[in-house]
Amino acid sequence: MKPDESPQYWDSISRTFTKDAHHSLWRSHSDQINMSLLEDWLGSRQVTNLLKTDLFDEAVSLGLYPLLSEHAGGVYGIDLAAESADEAKKQFPELEAVCADVRKLPFSDNQFDLIVSNSTLDHFQSKKEIDVGFQELFRVLGEGGELLISLDNLQNPIVGLRNLLPYRLLNRLKLVPYFVGKTFGRRGFAAALEKAGFEVLETKAIMHCPRVFAVAVSGILQRRASEKSQRRFLAFLQQFEFFGRLPTRFFTGYFVAIRARKPADPQSKKP
């Protein structure tokens, strides 16, 4: 395990974001983007057991737990960082928070009816590790269950350029706050899920605002602007999601989101 993938590293990132309130306005926008997607895909669905594959959102902001808990009898969450799992549990006592690696899940086969994974598996050094994560998600998801998953979008030119440059340089220039790893474009993402046995049902591109600009302005407004001005800025950022309806959406979106299903007869989908 590389230093940037270690639990200790992600513990330090969790501590930084938990203590730094300057990130909260941007985190609110990020949460809203993810909640809008999930509201669309979940509808009125109710499940027994739901798994969320990291707890960073719930450790540093409200995250997705309030929405997910409306749709599931039990919500489980994992995180490689014990600090994130602990902070999320403090905020949401009914959450079943577990310190674990998505590549080696401590759960039984077919345990979950639904899995939500927002930008968890795009922090690894290799695509092979992402494939291992997909295989584990397939294992613990019940037959007919759905996986709602997003990754950094390699088709976005900014993301593509970022992934060509050394992480140490980007971090030193404060362009990325934590390690970002390998990822896919839309077609490669879908192909990798299908290789793991999933049936891809729907693909979307999300988060279309100019991210570097938006993060920088969010930090300034968080420190200096009134709550009313901050709300207006969040509404302004939300307008960029219009680009998700255009043919160019997979070039402007920073994330690719896929709704996939584990077939009732999963062996029929395995290569």
Predicted regions and their residues:
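Conserved class I S-adenosyl-L-methionine
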Residues: 1-46, 148-170
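Acceptor-substrate binding/catalytic loop of class I
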Residues: 29, 171-188
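Class I SAM-dependent methyltransferase SAM/SAH-binding core
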Residues: 51-104
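A conserved beta-strand element that flanks and buttresses the S-adenosyl-L-methionine
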Residues: 116
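A short glycine-rich, Lys/Arg-flanked "PGG" loop and its adjoining helix->strand segment in the class I
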Residues: 131-146
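Short alpha-helix
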Residues: 180-197, 203
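A C-terminal cap/extension of S-adenosyl-L-methionine-dependent methyltransferases
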Residues: 202-271
